[in-house]
Amino acid sequence: MIAMSEEAKVIAFVAFCVESYKAAKNLSGEGVSSLFTRFGVDRYLYEEYEVLHTMGIDAVLADIDRFLEVRGGLA
């Protein structure tokens, strides 16, 4: 088995969050990517990986919603 670098783990986590959010909100990949980039969610997930990756996915998705709500990204 090949060990993943820390950087690869973070990237995989962010991708997992994008895919999970897409499925949970019934959005397109392009829509989630645009939303996350516009409001800085992608950067937030990357920078807060150490804390977020220890949480369950439902908690992470709820955290993303709170993050977006504070920044005006949720209608």
Segments predicted by a language model, with ranges:
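N-terminal acidic leader/helix
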Residues: 2-30
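N-terminal, charged low-complexity regulatory/assembly segments
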Residues: 13-17, 45, 67
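Amphipathic, hydrophobic secondary-structure cores in small proteins
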Residues: 21-24, 28-53
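Generic hydrophobic segment detector
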Residues: 11, 32, 71-75
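Long, compositionally biased
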Residues: 50-75
